[in-house]
Amino acid sequence: SVVKREDFSLPAYVDRRDYPLPDVAHVKHLSASQKALKEKEKASWSSLSMDEKVELYRIKFKETFAEMNRGSNEWKTVVGTATFFIGFTALIIMWQKRY
């Protein structure tokens, strides 16, 4: 088949605030540079630069807590849709009263 089926019996990665440590890492297939960084991680963390620490974090997690807590713009869609339907209903009521 064309579409790959998910096996839900295996652990999956998910970013959730109430479950901060997922069962598996975000990046499943590491590149050569990422593998080298994972080997360097086993040594002292004081020898790692800040960029390397951030890269290690991004291998394990997709988003930070700040990114997870960031608000979305979905409310604009909800308000716009509700306003559209209220206006459409008002037009129908005015049309019914006139004719």
Curated annotation (Swiss-Prot):
Which residues are on the Mitochondrial matrix side of the membrane? Answer: 1-73
* Transmembrane annotation, as ranges: 74-99
Question: What UniProt keywords apply to this chain's record, in alphabetical order?
Answer: Acetylation, Membrane, Mitochondrion, Mitochondrion inner membrane, Phosphoprotein, Transmembrane, Transmembrane helix
Which residues are recorded as modified (N6-acetyllysine)? 4, 28, 35, 42
One BP term from GO: mitochondrial electron transport, cytochrome c to oxygen
Q: How does it sit in the membrane?
A: Single-pass membrane protein
Cross-referenced InterPro entries: Cyt_c_oxidase_su4 (IPR013288), Cyt_c_oxidase_su4_fam (IPR004203), Cyt_c_oxidase_su4_sf (IPR036639)
What does the UniProt entry say about where the protein is found?
A: Mitochondrion inner membrane
**A cellular-component GO term for this protein:** respiratory chain complex IV
Give coiled-coil spans as residue ranges. Answer: none
Q: Which residues carry this modification: Phosphoserine?
A: 31, 33
N6-succinyllysine-modified residues are 4, 35
The pathway noted for it is: Energy metabolism; oxidative phosphorylation
Instruction: Briefly state the protein's biological role.
Output: Component of the cytochrome c oxidase, the last enzyme in the mitochondrial electron transport chain which drives oxidative phosphorylation. The respiratory chain contains 3 multisubunit complexes succinate dehydrogenase (complex II, CII), ubiquinol-cytochrome c oxidoreductase (cytochrome b-c1 complex, complex III, CIII) and cytochrome c oxidase (complex IV, CIV), that cooperate to transfer electrons derived from NADH and succinate to molecular oxygen, creating an electrochemical gradient over the inner membrane that drives transmembrane transport and the ATP synthase.
Subunit annotation: Component of the cytochrome c oxidase (complex IV, CIV), a multisubunit enzyme composed of 14 subunits. The complex is composed of a catalytic core of 3 subunits MT-CO1, MT-CO2 and MT-CO3, encoded in the mitochondrial DNA, and 11 supernumerary subunits COX4I, COX5A, COX5B, COX6A, COX6B, COX6C, COX7A, COX7B, COX7C, COX8 and NDUFA4, which are encoded in the nuclear genome.
> What protein family does this chain belong to?
Belongs to the cytochrome c oxidase IV family.
> What protein is this chain from?
Cytochrome c oxidase subunit 4 isoform 1, mitochondrial
Q: Which organism is it from?
A: Trachypithecus cristatus (Silvered leaf-monkey)
Taxonomic classification: Eukaryota, Metazoa, Chordata, Craniata, Vertebrata
